[in-house]
Regions:
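Histidine-centered active-site microenvironments of extracellular/periplasmic hydrolases
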Residues: 212-253, 302
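Short gly/pro-enriched beta-turn/loop segments at secondary-structure junctions
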Residues: 153, 199-203, 249-253
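A long, amphipathic alpha-helix that forms part
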Residues: 165-206
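DG-centered beta-turn motif at the end of beta-strands
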Residues: 1, 42, 209-212
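His/Asp/Glu-rich, glycine-adjacent segments
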Residues: 8, 12-13, 17-23, 28-156, ...
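Active-site neighborhoods of enzymes that stabilize oxyanions during catalysis
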Residues: 243-302
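Terminal interaction module
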Residues: 57, 110, 197, 201, ...
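Hydrophobic/aromatic residues located in beta-strands of well-ordered beta-sheets
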Residues: 109, 206-208
Length: 302
């Protein structure tokens, strides 16, 4: 639910409710603006440069391969936990500081997540210290959240992640009627259940945020480095792993990360910049780091 959707649905009763009783702020997403980076940050309290989890796919030195961190698997598969026999999760994921800090203050943290992936190997490390609760539907989650708040005798922190708007954006696009229908349904449910969730005299601070926004990507105009004839020969710049296998590009459609031979960085940048002029920026990772794109601190994990 990025800013474009706020502008589109700002007259919805639930958005109007939030505006009347709270504040609506426009936030800048971290870079890269992707689920893996932001879900990790909100659960650990660590920015991208410290957590090391910066994209859906990236090279992980512990396994010498490109992985899908949220799945705890090698890239190129939708199967979960293909890395389980290869490496321990704690060696891949960061230990968070957020939930331990809450518990020291006497606040018990809970995390509500879709049953398809709650709990998960990723969550066992990144969300360590929080009690996980799974749900099938949003209405179920909201009712269970309300019951939890009603029964709690001590301060609690609850995090509820709803992924269906994002999922339909990926499948149909952000302007598709299917996506808009899902957003409308979400806002109707929130308005219907809001008072029921937060009834009573307990003091509750409510925050709704998006991990990132959504932008259109047209497959028909996408440039594929491994297919387009203008990029023939580019493979000579690609770095290989310890077994001599080329490291496939990581990242996603709008922020592609290339793993290149150290001695070919300048040549590769010139090669790509010339062919992508006016279509994409080609920059070295060290420039992004120096400009603070990944946060003020860079850890060895990154």
């Amino acid at each position: 639910f990025g800013w474009r959707f706020y502008e589109r649905f700002q007259d919805a009763p639930f958005i109007q409710r939030v505006a009347r009783h709270g504040r609506i702020e426009k936030l800048t997403s971290q870079f890269p603006s992707t689920t893996a980076a932001h879900v990790t940050t909100i659960h650990t309290g660590l920015p991208v440069g410290v957590s090391g989890v910066h994209e859906w796919y990236y090279y992980e030195p512990q396994v010498d391969a490109v992985i899908a961190p949220l799945l705890f698997s090698y890239s190129g598969t939708r199967e979960r936990d293909t890395l389980k026999s290869i490496v321990k999760p704690a060696a891949v994921y960061p230990q968070g500081v957020f939930y331990p800090a809450l518990k020291k203050l006497g606040v018990k943290p809970y995390v509500f997540g879709i049953r398809d992936y709650t709990p998960s190997t990723y969550a066992s490390v990144v969300m360590q210290g929080a009690e996980q609760k799974s749900f099938k539907t949003l209405s179920e989650a909201l009712i269970n959240l309300g019951i939890l708040l009603e029964r709690s005798k001590k301060p609690v922190y609850t995090h509820l992640y709803f992924d269906k708007i994002d999922a339909l954006c990926h499948e149909y696009g952000p302007t598709a009627p299917q996506t808009e229908a899902e957003i409308e349904t979400f806002l109707l449910l929130m308005e219907h259940y809001f008072d029921r969730i937060f009834k009573g005299r307990k003091r509750v601070l409510f925050l709704m945020t998006a991990d990132h926004g959504a932008s259109e990507v047209n497959p028909e105009t996408t440039i594929y480095l491994n297919i387009h004839p203008h990029f023939a020969g580019f493979e000579r710049f690609i770095r290989a792993n310890r077994n001599g296998q080329p490291l496939v590009p990581a990242g996603s459609a709008r922020d592609l990360f290339l793993y290149l031979r150290e001695d070919s960085l300048d040549d590769a940048q010139a090669f790509l910049s010339k062919r992508l002029e006016g279509k994409a920026d080609v920059v070295k990772a060290e420039y992004l780091i120096s400009e603070g794109y990944f946060g003020p601190e860079i850890s060895p994990r990154f």
